[in-house]
């Protein structure tokens, strides 16, 4: 337990930020999983494309704001793009 008033405040801030960061990362994982499920279900290309766009947009935002490392965001975008392009060619 913090002994100083400022340390108590820092603890509260840290807990709030941690919860916010976890929520953002969880939202990203959900978007990626939704895209993968649509591909597995052989959904319409337009549905998969909208899921792809939202996932890439979220990756860009989290990478720029350092919620995830920029290189990780780039790597995930590349993986999703390959997955989407493979699906689009198969259609």
From Swiss-Prot:
- Region Disordered: list its residue ranges: 1-25
Q: Which residues form a coiled coil?
A: none
* CC terms in the record's Gene Ontology section: cytosol; small ribosomal subunit
Source organism superkingdom: Bacteria
HAMAP family xref list: Ribosomal_bS20
Main function: Binds directly to 16S ribosomal RNA.
Q: This protein is called what?
A: Small ribosomal subunit protein bS20
């Amino acid at each position: 337990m913090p002994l100083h008033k400022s340390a108590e405040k820092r603890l509260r801030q840290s807990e709030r930020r941690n919860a916010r960061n976890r929520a953002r990362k969880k939202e990203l994982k959900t978007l990626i999983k939704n895209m993968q499920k649509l591909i597995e279900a052989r959904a319409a290309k337009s549905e998969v494309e909208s899921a792809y766009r939202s996932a890439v947009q979220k990756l860009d935002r989290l990478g720029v704001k350092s919620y995830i490392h920029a290189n990780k965001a780039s790597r995930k975008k590349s993986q999703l793009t390959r997955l989407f392009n493979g699906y689009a060619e198969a259609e």
